[in-house]
């Protein structure tokens, strides 16, 4: 059993994987003050709902993190409670899969490395646009030869929600959720509709502009926490909420020879 951990700015995804298949998964809030013992307690409670001894089968772990302050706590979690040294995803792991970062600043987040590894494994001969809808929404352009040659970085849906909460005194707190129509007659519903349709319009607009500017025929892949808002979108060829987790597992297996 492999534990794949994706530490994002807003939430941390944890998945138990066996033979490349996700057996169970959980999402908890990302907190720099959470100790290794607290992580273990949290995971133990969540895992026990499936099986009392499921964690006994853990033989390895891999971590994608964009929150450095969390790294030591998660590393200690596995060293102290599982007696294993976890693999931290870095840009160098892209080389193992023939991927090249051809950007002016050739350093990207570990989650993006995992996304690109997983996407390229499934579509090895395609030019790809891989969209990760996390705290930030990142559009990755990967050519069929494995070169990451372009990117767009925009706000994520959680950033938009947070901004509305922080920058307005009288508007009610709300979440982004699907809305059938954009024009509403209540403040709460109007906020939800504005967040939902506004975010969708941003992603669709950027995607279509990328495709207009591109000389390649792009296969569009979407993942991340915000991807649940994008069902039935004809410009997204494939939606995979587990793309990052799959990439983390693939990188772990590759490093083990």
Swiss-Prot record:
Q: Which UniProt keywords apply?
A: ATP-binding, Coenzyme A biosynthesis, Cytoplasm, Kinase, Metal-binding, Nucleotide-binding, Potassium, Transferase
Q: Which residues bind ATP?
A: 6-13, 135
What is the protein's major site of localization? Answer: cytoplasm
How is the cofactor bound, in the record's words?
A monovalent cation. Ammonium or potassium.
Which residues catalyse the reaction?
111
- Give the cofactors, semicolon-separated: NH4(+); K(+)
Q: Which GO terms describe its biological process?
A: coenzyme A biosynthetic process
The reaction(s) this protein catalyses:
(R)-pantothenate + ATP = (R)-4'-phosphopantothenate + ADP + H(+)
Its EC number is 2.7.1.33
Pathway recorded for this protein: Cofactor biosynthesis; coenzyme A biosynthesis; CoA from (R)-pantothenate: step 1/5
Which cellular component terms (GO) are annotated to the entry? Answer: cytoplasm
Q: Which InterPro entries match?
A: ATPase_NBD, Type_III_PanK
Please name the CDD domains in this protein's record: ASKHA_NBD_PanK-III
Question: Which positions does UniProt annotate for substrate binding?
Answer: 109-112, 187
- The UniProt record gives the binding positions of K(+) as 132
Q: Which GO terms describe its molecular function?
A: ATP binding; metal ion binding; pantothenate kinase activity
- Coiled-coil region(s) at which residues? none
Looking up NCBIfam families in the UniProt record yields: baf, PRK13318.1-6
PANTHER family attached to this UniProt entry: TYPE III PANTOTHENATE KINASE (PTHR34265:SF1)
- Which family is it part of? Belongs to the type III pantothenate kinase family.
Q: How does it assemble?
A: Homodimer.
Q: What is this protein called?
A: Type III pantothenate kinase
Upper classification of the source organism reads: Bacteria, Pseudomonadati, Pseudomonadota, Alphaproteobacteria, Rickettsiales
């Amino acid at each position: 059993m492999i534990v794949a951990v994706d530490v994002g700015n807003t939430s941390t995804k944890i998945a138990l994987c066996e033979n490349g298949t996700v057996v169970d998964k959980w999402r908890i809030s990302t907190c720099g003050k959470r100790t290794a013992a607290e992580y273990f307690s949290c995971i133990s409670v969540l895992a026990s709902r499936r099986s009392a001894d499921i964690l006994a089968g853990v033989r390895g772990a891999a971590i994608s993190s964009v929150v450095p302050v969390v790294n030591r706590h998660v590393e200690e979690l596995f060293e102290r409670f599982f007696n294993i040294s976890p693999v931290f995803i870095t840009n160098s792991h892209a080389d193992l899969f023939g991927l090249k970062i051809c950007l002016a600043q050739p350093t990207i987040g570990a989650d993006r490395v995992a996304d690109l590894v997983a996407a390229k494994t499934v579509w090895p001969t395609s030019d790809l646009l891989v969209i990760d809808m996390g705290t930030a929404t990142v559009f990755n352009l990967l050519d069929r030869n494995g070169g990451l040659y372009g990117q767009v970085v925009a706000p994520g849906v959680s950033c938009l929600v947070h901004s509305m909460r922080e920058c307005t005194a009288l508007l009610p707190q709300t979440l982004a959720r699907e809305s059938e129509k954009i024009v509403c007659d209540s403040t709460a519903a109007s906020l939800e509709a504005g967040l939902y349709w506004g975010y969708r319009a941003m992603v669709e607009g950027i995607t279509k502009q990328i495709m207009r500017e591109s000389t390649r025929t792009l296969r569009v892949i979407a993942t991340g926490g915000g991807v649940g808002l994008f069902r039935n979108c004809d410009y997204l060829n494939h939606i995979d909420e587990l793309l990052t987790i799959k990439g983390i597992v693939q990188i772990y297996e590759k490093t083990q020879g």
